[in-house]
């Protein structure tokens, strides 16, 4: 094991950086902070734990990480600004050019990145953004928070998560500016949480009408606070023989949900198509996970978005067992079961079980689902669309952070848990799409024509 980093305890601090012994990731963080003159604030009362083993632990609080950098002996005066680096490079190039003819392949004329600069992005999940004003916890604001103006060099970066994060709030020194008319949603006397809360309760009410026998009077009385479309008594056993995937009414419900997303109407036609398709996949995974956590986890039942359930204790056979065929009456049933059940088992093991352990509240679920949609769509949008995506993600992450740092909210560890869960949720959504493509290609399902169109869309 190598020498430990004085900041995050990584056993890779083989040399000194800026006067202190630290790893390349912490050195890159320190250099970027000083060079860009970034300011942070810690929302916790006690020093936050900074550790290399988990990315969320290393990045959970930039203010505390910066303090540890200074405690390790790192000095800001040893960090050269980008302007100084450019001047040095230009002088070096001029000297090289005076000694030899220019060579387009020579190191002096190529833009290169040092290992530390490369490490800067490989270890970073979230880019620093200029600070927005603190987002309110109470849903009694007259307008949603406006995004801040991004630095040009920062807005062009595209790391896996390039929004603000957790307890490190961006600096308030940056001036805020309103977006063009129609770019931001304008819901008076409503907060961002209320907005996504209303979207989700509306979707729950539609599913309750569609898939249960609940009276309309009850639905009208409870729709504003409906957090799950089903009760345990509403659930029906899943029948793979009649399963057709998503049907037309499912797409209608999600269409209404999608069009209510902030800035959706400002997307191009291609971006709207992309955004809607991502919502369909993310909703199936995340809503199933949430409904299961609320209704089926105690009975080890996987609850689907249409109110059907599958018993998962013990796990059903996948259909790939040696003697699996003898349990089915015909080859058609066997083929359909073998195509569908591995997909459901994978969703259960890879997403629903770990998500259920988080014990998310309905408010956390509303924000996390919207954030997952924005993140899943980000790299499929144009640069203009990505800018809108970054803006909306920053608003959600900022509010989620404030909510988790309220009394009893769990603090930075809770924020880290929720944000890290997006990794396996997005992966399951991608696998779900791939599985449906295969099911339609081989005509395993008698799918709705809308589902065929969704799966044939060219990204």
Curated annotation (Swiss-Prot):
InterPro entries annotated for this entry?
A: NHR-like_dom_sf, Nucl_hrmn_rcpt_lig-bd, Nuclear_hrmn_rcpt, Znf_hrmn_rcpt, Znf_NHR/GATA
Domain of life of the organism encoding this protein: Eukaryota
Its annotated compartments are:
Nucleus
Q: Which GO terms describe its molecular function?
A: DNA-binding transcription factor activity; sequence-specific DNA binding; zinc ion binding
Q: Belongs to which family? A: Belongs to the nuclear hormone receptor family.
Q: What does this protein do?
A: Orphan nuclear receptor.
Q: What is this protein called?
A: Nuclear hormone receptor family member nhr-11
Which organism is the protein's source? Caenorhabditis elegans
